[in-house]
């Protein structure tokens, strides 16, 4: 019997792979998309997250015709301001300054392209409250390095989890992949593990 279409995860994020494993989904392979993630002029955080997820899926689908391709992008926003993925100490200090003592949104766009080329997307928005950080908390977090490569400079599953005062929405989405919506996308487009 011939094997069905493969599931390709268009992400290098170990967190997304772990989240999928929690619900019994194991991608056949991982093929990260390398795209320009710079926000477009006047692009809202919602549109940005969805656009990047779909763009990542399309780039990888072109390399994997006949397979399912799953992609996601997580954006942290304070109002309409999209925070960067922190790569430097300057990035994380900027993010922490904006997040400290405020509510913000974590938006995760998910895109799935089916073997026949059909595409579907979902966007999950979660409201997150951040405590006001003391200088010692901020400096300790920066020294930890846990912020590297994270949208908005933090991961809720690490030290920064202690800064969260409130979370309204999807915890897995804040980690990097909304599981309920992702499973619905997969089944809706005919993926069967």
Curated annotation (Swiss-Prot):
GO cellular component: cytoplasm
Keyword Cytoplasm: yes
EC number(s) from the headed UniProt entry: 3.6.1.9
Catalytic activity: dTTP + H2O = dTMP + diphosphate + H(+); UTP + H2O = UMP + diphosphate + H(+)
Important for substrate specificity (site feature) positions: 15, 74, 157
Active site: 73 (proton acceptor)
Broad class of the protein's primary localization: cytoplasm
SUPFAM superfamilies: ITPase-like
Needed co-factor(s): a divalent metal cation
GO molecular function: dTTP diphosphatase activity; UTP diphosphatase activity
A GO biological process held by the record: nucleotide metabolic process
Keywords: Cytoplasm, Hydrolase, Nucleotide metabolism
Subcellular location: Cytoplasm
InterPro entries: ITPase-like_fam, Maf-like
Family assignment from sequence similarity: Belongs to the Maf family. YhdE subfamily.
Protein function: Nucleoside triphosphate pyrophosphatase that hydrolyzes dTTP and UTP. May have a dual role in cell division arrest and in preventing the incorporation of modified nucleotides into cellular nucleic acids.
Identification of the protein by name: dTTP/UTP pyrophosphatase
Organism of origin: Caulobacter vibrioides (strain ATCC 19089 / CIP 103742 / CB 15) (Caulobacter crescentus)
Source organism phylogeny: Bacteria, Pseudomonadati, Pseudomonadota, Alphaproteobacteria, Caulobacterales
């Amino acid at each position: 019997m011939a094997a069905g279409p493969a599931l390709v995860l268009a992400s290098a994020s170990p967190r997304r792979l772990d989240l999928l494993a929690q619900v019994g989904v194991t991608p056949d392979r991982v093929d990260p998309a390398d795209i320009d993630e710079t926000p477009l002029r006047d692009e809202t955080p919602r549109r940005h997250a969805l656009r990047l997820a779909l763009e990542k899926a399309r780039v990888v689908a072109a390399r994997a015709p006949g397979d399912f391709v799953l992609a996601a992008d997580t954006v942290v926003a304070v109002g309409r301001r999209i925070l960067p993925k922190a790569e430097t100490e300057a990035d994380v200090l900027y993010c922490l300054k904006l997040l400290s003592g405020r509510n913000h949104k974590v938006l995760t766009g998910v895109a799935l392209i089916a073997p026949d080329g059909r595409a579907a997307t979902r966007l999950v928005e979660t409201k997150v409250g951040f405590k006001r950080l003391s200088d010692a908390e901020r400096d300790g977090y920066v020294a930890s390095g846990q912020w590297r490569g994270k949208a908005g400079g933090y991961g809720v599953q690490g030290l920064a989890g202690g800064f969260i005062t409130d979370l309204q929405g999807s915890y897995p989405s804040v980690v990097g992949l909304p599981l309920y919506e992702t499973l619905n996308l997969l089944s809706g487009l005919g993926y069967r593990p």
